[in-house]
Regions:
Chain B
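ER/Golgi luminal nucleotide-sugar-dependent glycosyltransferases, focusing on the catalytic module
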Residues: 1-255
Length: 203, 255
């Protein structure tokens, strides 16, 4: 995982300003929620988390916590959150069993001015995670996922926690075989640890 | 050039005169015109009746989606059943508008509605005694306009400075929907209005009695006027046909 300070600021800045209600899909350490609350103290945050222990932790920073699994809740669950100003997934979308279905259900209840922000691990990152998530995508796969869920990606940010190690860069150079544009494409694909994706309903 | 660009005429109730055949009638609320589009048939009952506070904008949001689905290009025109922006106005100029009897509509040729098909035709900008905000407050409730423009800033539709300058300025284009403009302008402007209206409804909408309940429509009109004026300025003020609106009424002169 990248350093919290490195991704929290751009993530927070992509979230809708001064939200009445934000929905956080999956519990985290609360760093992002606290950073957002510092800017917008009157905003409400609801966390949806299936794991009882993680849900209990989330109560430390969230106004409300639903212990529920987004993969299996009914359409009525999503409908009751139709008044949320935005949803965000902090490296949790790739942990859903059916991420496309979850996105689709959120997208169906979202008002037109709201958005989904997701920080998603890059499958092509040079360093494979110790515990791979349920799903792994490269950028093209992420864009396909959102488009297939009725959502339009309106912005994206590469999260680069640091430069490539020398040996990784040397390997990519070899792979590129002297082709500079291919080398640039390989570096661009493998350097980001995550992508920050902002999407809105396709309506 | 397409000889008959898409042209929509919006009405919320039946009326006693006939609009030109090239226009697509659009019925807002529960009004179902004999031909054309009826919001009550295209949308859910709740959505169609949201014209209570959104006015004609419910129909405009839907038309925008249709234009995108049709991959429409070029220009698109809009009028209300009794309000038009014409290249050659009819009737008698009274204050900021022309007043004309509905029978005079028979004298209006299609090209008076859409000109050469590639030049924007828009209502004139009207200057008021006070600021835009004061003029709004004099008619309804200033708080609504302030909140609406705050939401427009939060949605990224306008900047703080643009909002401050517009609300403290003394002029805007009334009935900015009534225009013949590039499809792209319409799609972009209506998209922005829908974002702001959606956020405003969730965050700041307050029910008001009677006519004043159309607060979101009134606020949309001001923001639309600003967004249209911005595009006119970029296009070139001298390359746009700006005319006083023509209003029809049974008691108006029949020349």
């Amino acid at each position: 995982m990248s350093e919290p300070a490195a991704y929290i600021a751009p993530f927070r800045d992509l979230l809708p300003p001064n939200a009445r209600l934000l929905v956080q899909a999956g519990a985290g350490d609360g760093g992002l929620a606290r950073a957002y609350r510092k800017l917008y103290p009157a905003s409400g945050l609801m966390v949806v988390e299936a794991d009882p222990a993680l849900a209990a932790q989330a109560r430390e920073y969230a106004d409300r916590v639903y212990q529920a699994d987004l993969d299996s809740v009914s359409a009525a669950f999503y409908q009751q959150l139709a008044w949320a100003d935005g949803w965000y997934f902090d490296a949790t979308l790739e942990q859903c069993q059916q991420p496309g279905r979850v996105l689709q259900q959120v997208g169906q209840v979202m008002p037109v001015d709201t958005c989904i922000i997701a920080r998603i691990a890059n499958r092509s990152h040079w360093q494979a995670p110790e515990t791979p998530p349920q799903h792994q995508w490269d950028l093209a796969g992420m864009l396909t996922l959102f488009a297939g869920s009725g959502l339009r990606v309106i912005s994206g940010i590469l999260l680069n926690p640091g430069p490539l190690p020398a040996e990784v860069e040397a390997r990519l150079r070899e792979q590129a075989g002297g082709d500079d544009s291919m080398l640039a494409a390989l570096v661009e694909a493998t350097q980001p640890s995550h992508y920050l994706i902002k999407a809105v309903p396709e309506r | 050039m397409n000889p008959t660009p898409p042209f929509y005429c919006i009405a919320h109730a039946p009326f006693n005169w006939k609009m030109p055949d090239f226009m697509t009638m659009v019925g807002s609320g529960d009004y179902v015109p004999e031909t054309g589009l009826a919001m009550s048939q295209l949308l859910s009952p709740e959505e169609a009746l949201s014209n209570r506070y959104l006015g004609e904008y419910v129909a405009l949001f839907e038309i925008r989606r249709r234009l995108i689905a049709e991959q429409a290009e070029g220009f698109v025109g809009f009028c209300h059943y009794r309000r038009f922006a014409l290249t050659d106005p009819i009737g008698v100029l009274h204050q900021f508008n022309y007043h004309a009897h509905p029978d005079m509509l028979a004298k209006v040729r299609p090209e008076h509605f859409y000109g050469d098909g590639q030049t924007p035709i828009v209502p004139i900008s009207v200057t008021w005694a006070g600021s835009v905000l004061q003029q709004y407050e004099a008619c309804v409730t200033g708080r609504d306009l302030l909140m609406f423009f705050g939401d427009a800033i939060d949605c990224g539709v306008i900047t703080n400075l643009e909002a401050a300058n517009f609300l403290s300025g003394k002029a805007f284009i009334p009935a900015p929907t009534v225009a013949f403009i590039p499809v792209q302008w319409f799609v972009e402007i209506i998209h922005d209005l829908e974002l702001v209206a959606s956020r405003y409804y969730r965050h700041h909408y307050v029910y008001r009695e009677g006519y004043a309940d159309r607060s979101i429509a009134f606020c949309c009109e001001r923001l639309q006027a600003f967004l249209l004026a911005k595009r006119i300025a970029a296009w070139g003020q001298d390359k746009v046909i700006q005319r006083p609106l023509v209003l029809l009424g049974d008691t108006y002169p029949n020349l």
